[in-house]
């Protein structure tokens, strides 16, 4: 029974305090009561903490979007994190693309130029997928986790103490108001005692809040180190991807797009990257087409009408019916035709005949 009486009294006291704060807050808003202002230093610290919280949240959320663009995947990871369980490993986009390329290359045949290239590209895409996974893991651990710890830990503590300071300030101003309204000596003495207590509690809470807020500078320093870790992780990722693509380009013998054949023109010749390097300064780009000084053995052929055997260096798909498609390593017969563009020869394979680009050929003795 005594416990029940105590609980009722406590509930009544809490209700009275809440009502007193509500009245004080309302009168302040209406301009009917004075408000104790916080000192400028404390106000600046509060503003700095609020600003830090807002921008930290924005940076954290956008970094999550950058690392995982799929919103469904982010929600799934969030749920598993709240359940304190590890999210199942899922294949990422580069890895999926890589697998499709490898499967396609296997289907087309690893022995064909296109199939072999697809397999090599697929393997590179898988390496990029692995690098992407490592970037996400490193960034989450070294950058996102510290930011989230601040939002969900340090700032929540600051917000709690700030709210408590606001309540102590309302209690203090309510006590000041009651003292002003007190007329009887006994009531005035009681109000003065209450004011001293509320002032002491307010000062104590202001000091606690100030000490917490001064830790924001340390938070900034910590987040700076985390930012450097994030930049280093990105630098490693992009350097890896660049190296993977550079290696792939070398494997494929890739060449710049302006060296590709123009299907709408017959005056230009596609030049493989490796061959253009071998030719060197003799290759010059002009008005979208490529003019090449032919190797001496091809010049000899142009000056004669004799047929010669030539080995095909690279696969070539005919752009139209006047051209002849080629397969790497096959041997065909070639000869010159009066009036034909200098970058082309006439090729013959059995009953098939058509123009072929000279840069795809190696004349045989």
Curated annotation (Swiss-Prot):
Q: State the residue spans of region: Required for membrane binding.
A: 1-37
Q: List residues modified as Phosphothreonine.
A: 145
Q: What does the UniProt entry say about where the protein is found?
A: Cytoplasm; Golgi apparatus membrane; Mitochondrion outer membrane; Cytoplasmic vesicle, Autophagosome membrane
Gene Ontology CC terms: autophagosome membrane; cytoplasmic vesicle; cytosol; endoplasmic reticulum; Golgi membrane; membrane; midbody; mitochondrial envelope
Found, by tissue, as follows: Isoform 1 is widely expressed. Isoform 2 is brain-specific. Isoform 3 is predominantly expressed in testis, but it is also detected in liver and, at much lower levels, in skin, stomach and ovary.
Membrane-binding amphipathic helix: where is this region? Answer: 1-30
Q: Which residues form a coiled coil?
A: 155-186
**Sites bearing N-acetylmethionine, chain numbering:** 1
* Free-text domain note: An N-terminal amphipathic helix, the BAR domain and a second amphipathic helix inserted into helix 1 of the BAR domain (N-BAR domain) induce membrane curvature and bind curved membranes.
Q: What is this protein called?
A: Endophilin-B1
- What gene does the UniProt entry assign to this protein? Sh3glb1
């Amino acid at each position: 029974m005594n416990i029940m009486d105590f609980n009722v009294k406590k509930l009544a006291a809490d209700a009275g305090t809440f009502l007193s704060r509500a009245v004080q807050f309302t009168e302040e808003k209406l301009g009917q009561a004075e408000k104790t202002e916080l000192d400028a230093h404390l106000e600046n610290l509060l503003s700095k903490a609020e600003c830090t919280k807002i921008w930290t949240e924005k940076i954290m959320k956008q970094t999550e979007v950058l690392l995982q663009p799929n919103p469904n995947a982010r929600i799934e990871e969030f749920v598993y994190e709240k359940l304190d369980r590890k999210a199942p490993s899922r294949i990422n986009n580069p890895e999926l693309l890589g697998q499709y390329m490898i499967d396609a290359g296997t289907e087309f045949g690893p022995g064909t130029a296109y199939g072999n290239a697809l397999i090599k590209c697929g393997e590179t895409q898988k390496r990029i997928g692995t690098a992407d996974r490592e970037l996400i893991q490193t960034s989450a651990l070294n950058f996102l986790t510290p930011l989230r710890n601040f939002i969900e830990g340090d700032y929540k503590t600051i917000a709690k103490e700030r709210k408590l300071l606001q309540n102590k300030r309302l209690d203090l101003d309510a006590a000041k108001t009651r003292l002003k309204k007190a007329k009887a000596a006994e009531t005035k003495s009681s109000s003065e005692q209450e004011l001293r207590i509320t002032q002491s509690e307010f000062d104590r809470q202001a000091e606690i809040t100030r000490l917490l807020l001064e830790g924001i500078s340390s938070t900034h320093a910590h987040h700076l180190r985390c930012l450097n870790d994030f930049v280093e992780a990105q630098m490693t990722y992009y350097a890896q991807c660049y190296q993977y693509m550079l290696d792939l380009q070398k494997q494929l013998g890739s060449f710049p797009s302006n060296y590709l054949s123009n299907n709408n023109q017959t005056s230009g010749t596609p030049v493989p990257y490796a061959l253009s390097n071998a030719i060197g300064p003799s290759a010059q780009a002009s008005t979208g087409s490529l003019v090449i000084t032919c190797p001496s053995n091809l010049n000899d052929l142009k000056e004669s009408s004799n047929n010669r055997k030539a080995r095909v260096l690279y696969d070539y798909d005919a752009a139209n019916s006047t051209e002849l498609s080629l397969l790497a390593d096959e041997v065909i017969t070639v000869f010159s035709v009066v009036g034909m563009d200098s970058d082309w020869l006439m090729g013959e394979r059995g009953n098939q005949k058509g123009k072929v680009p000279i840069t795809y050929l190696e004349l045989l003795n």
